[in-house]
């Protein structure tokens, strides 16, 4: 089951990723978003991804899985946080998460390091790319993990845009692609229908979810 809450925030099975909620695309209540969530995963330290992880983790007594530096930061603030790094795998509360490379920055603030940005393979079938530019080792992610579903940023400016995301699809070659990280703010506004048309021409299924509506995939 996959549910999109705008920007890069998804619920994948029992894992909530990058909990930037509320956001300009989503004003759903916490109780609805956190229903069934047993793990929070954070790809990097920027505010639109670390989001409300601290508040949600404390309120709902849910552990946070993230890179080592962010886990230390959260632990010092009273959060149950599990640190890991790129290439590592953790199994927690019935979820399996493997941290993979991303090309992006990650500072929590100008004075607090957020380690390095990353993506996740969730339960061996979903690839959440995090914030990233295009990089050649996406081909290795496709070869090694063979994700059925890829959640890819398309908004440009701070991540891949549409054209780069299309190349990423050819490197990873998942069965299903779900676009993310677009139209949240004016700087990352794109025509998602353009992406859908071009991606489908590559032979993959593209799904543009409605906010808060679960997809049985």
UniProtKB/Swiss-Prot annotation:
SMART domains: Lactamase_B (SM00849). Keywords: Hydrolase. InterPro entries: Metallo-B-lactamas (IPR001279), RibonucZ/Hydroxyglut_hydro (IPR036866), UPF0173 (IPR022877), UPF0173_UPF0282_UlaG_hydrolase (IPR050114). Pfam families: Lactamase_B_2 (PF12706). It comes from the Archaea. Coiled coil: none annotated. GO terms for molecular function: hydrolase activity. Belongs to the UPF0173 family. This is UPF0173 metal-dependent hydrolase MJ1163. It comes from Methanocaldococcus jannaschii (strain ATCC 43067 / DSM 2661 / JAL-1 / JCM 10045 / NBRC 100440).
